[in-house]
Amino acid sequence: MNNIWWQTKGQGNVHLVLLHGWGLNAEVWRCIDEELSSHFTLHLVDLPGFGRSRGFGALSLADMAEVVLRQAPDKAIWLGWSLGGLVASQIALTHPERVLALVTVASSPCFSARDEWPGIKPDVLAGFQQQLSDDFQRTVERFLALQTMGTETARQDARALKKTVLALPMPEVDVLNGGLEILKTVDLRLPLQNVSMPFLRLYGYLDGLVPRKVVPMLDKLWPHSESYIFAKAAHAPFISHPVEFHHLLVALKQRV
């Protein structure tokens, strides 16, 4: 089976694996990788089918997690942003012995709105799937614009995300559709009640994709976890608030 693209940098005594979000690739971490690699051995990954990890079709969440795990260090802090947060969470559920701590960034265990659960309306996700077939690049760009909307640095943050996407060949439409299908259908709210490793959840107050209303709901559902909200961030707090983001991860390292 194909290997995925994987880059390791830094010599820290704790491994930190970074998993990107839908439509993107590991270049999205370049705004913080230098700082982080002075504290961690950093692992930058292109998820299967994204960026330089070619030769994969659409995968289920479970299969995506298994592919990523094949090349991973024995034990690491796993950090996942958005869709990557679901992949990191799946690894924490199925291989807890490999996970020193779980960090989710602007991620929800259930992205899709359900009864009494705030999220993205299913018809919005279905609409993105339909539009992918019609106008592939414009749909991805619209999704990226949603991620930074409302922040003081929205334009430059959106430019940074767009640059990341355009730096490498676009994923295949079926891979993008598969990722949207995961966002539309997966619900890890109850399974994640059972994880016992340190669990840090990071959110943006202005996030239009993961509503801040989920934060107190998950605080109650997962009392063993910790949450932090970036007051002026949207869906990409590591781009808009890199220093604050870095400090939170270094503080977590002291506790594992």
From Swiss-Prot:
Entry protein name: Pimeloyl-[acyl-carrier protein] methyl ester esterase
EC number annotated for this UniProt entry: 3.1.1.85
Q: Where is the AB hydrolase-1 domain?
A: 15-242
| Domain of life of the organism encoding this protein | Bacteria
- To which species is this protein native? Escherichia coli O6:K15:H31 (strain 536 / UPEC)
Can you supply one Gene Ontology CC term for this chain's record?
cytoplasm
Compartments annotated for it: namely: Cytoplasm
In which pathway does this enzyme or protein participate?
A: Cofactor biosynthesis; biotin biosynthesis
Query: What gene is it encoded by?
Result: bioH
Report the principal subcellular site. cytoplasm
